[in-house]
Amino acid sequence: MLSPTNSISKTAPVPPQDSSKPVLISEEPQNQLLQKVARTALAVLLVVVTLGLILLFYSFSDLQSFPWCCQTRPSTKEQPTISIPVPLPSPPLAVPRPSTPPPPVISRPSTPPAPTPAISPPSTPSAPKPSTPPPLPPKAPKPVKTQEDLLPFVPEQVFVEMYEDMARRRIIEALVPAWDSDIIFKCLCYFHTLYPGLIPLETFPPATIFNFKQKIISILEDKKAVLRGEPIKGSLPICCSEENYRRHLQGTTLLPVFMWYHPTPKTLSDTMQTMKQLAIKGSVGASHWLLVIVDIQARRLVYFDSLYNYVMSPEDMKKDLQSFAQQLDQVYPAYDSQIFSVKIAAKEVIQKGSGSSCGAWCCQFLHWYLRDPFTDALNDLPVDSVERHENLASFVQACEAAVQDLPELFWPEAKALF
């Protein structure tokens, strides 16, 4: 048995090669070369087929628009430039189109509508020039708008009424000037000479909607003290001696309380501050005079507002005064147990067309009440506002003439009853 280490491999003797015979290529490298040639030919065929399909679907001018076509790339070496003649595309037919006319503008019927330009059928030019645009049709003329067209139509009667109202206001303001507290106090002093039962209460500082009730109660308390022979507890008037004031309280039967009102302030201190500011400016602003008559003899509270409801509605004011009348029955009871009644005098706006005649209207109403307290003189007022203020102007002129000789802020001397 032969061991593998000692075994001798038997090989065929290799004949000596002859250097004169050519060396033949083996079959395996030859097959690889054929495969490469076949692959290259197949790739070239696919490229040719693809380009052919592309040329079928796209024209040469479309191929030029692609970004990857005919692009120049920077190169260090100069390469020959191959110019391919490209046929120019045929120019499109230029068809003139009319421009869109502007939208119609609505104007007055008197202005005729703008004529619509006639549109001619498009014509094909033989040799159009692309650079020259087609002529545009003429535009329709725009209607000219005047200032009268922009303003809304207002009837002539409205202007006539506005002019008449403005003229009426100017006439009324010229007839009846605004009355301040000094003239009102002088008017009260003049009324005292005609009706001694009226006490000329000072109007500066005037009562307000916030303190007129306390002022009336204080005066009635002082009147009771004078009738008992006791000293008064309230404050004395600025321009009246204590003896003269006691005589006035003893013989008075009617208290004319003038109230100064402004709609802005909501407290007594704010009202006084507003009054000072308006006095410095010399303007009445939105201030208003009101009148409350306390008729002690007739046991009646009379409220007069020439603007009718400037402070509050007449119904609310009547309820407030009725509650106050019950309080006065306790403060100043009558010997026959008669209670105070309440009357709202104005049934409409009295001072139509005037904003500064409230003080004069309060004095006029007080004069009517003193003359006849049981006749309502407001029912006989003229309907026309100018005629109404003409009558008021006559009263104002008579009062201003009567108070010229009266001293400034000085109480008249009251006569002693006993």
Swiss-Prot record:
Q: Which cellular component terms (GO) are annotated to the entry?
A: extracellular region; host cell; membrane
Q: How does it sit in the membrane?
A: Single-pass membrane protein
- Provide the E.C. number(s) assigned to this enzyme: 3.4.22.-
Protein family membership? Belongs to the peptidase C48 family.
Per the record, where are the segments of Polar residues compositional bias?
Answer: 1-10
GO molecular function terms attached to this record = cysteine-type deubiquitinase activity; deNEDDylase activity
Keyword NAD, does the record have it? Answer: no
> Compositional bias of type Pro residues: which residue ranges?
86-141
Coding gene? Answer: cdu1
Active site residues per record: H288, D305, C358
**Where do the record's region annotations for Disordered lie?**
1-23, 72-144
Q: Where are the transmembrane segments?
A: 40-60
Name of this protein: Deubiquitinase and deneddylase Dub1
Q: Which domain of life is it from?
A: Bacteria
Which UniProt keywords are present, listed alphabetically? Hydrolase, Membrane, Protease, Secreted, Thiol protease, Transmembrane, Transmembrane helix, Ubl conjugation pathway, Virulence
Which InterPro entries does this UniProt record tie to the protein? Papain-like_cys_pep_sf (IPR038765), Peptidase_C48_C (IPR003653)
Q: What class of enzyme is it?
A: hydrolase
Q: Which organism is it from?
A: Chlamydia trachomatis serovar B (strain Jali20/OT)
Q: What does this protein do?
A: Effector proteins function to alter host cell physiology and promote bacterial survival in host tissues. This protease possesses deubiquitinating and deneddylating activities.
Where does the record say this protein resides?
A: Secreted; Host cell; Membrane
Q: What is its main location?
A: secreted
One GO term (biological process)? protein deneddylation
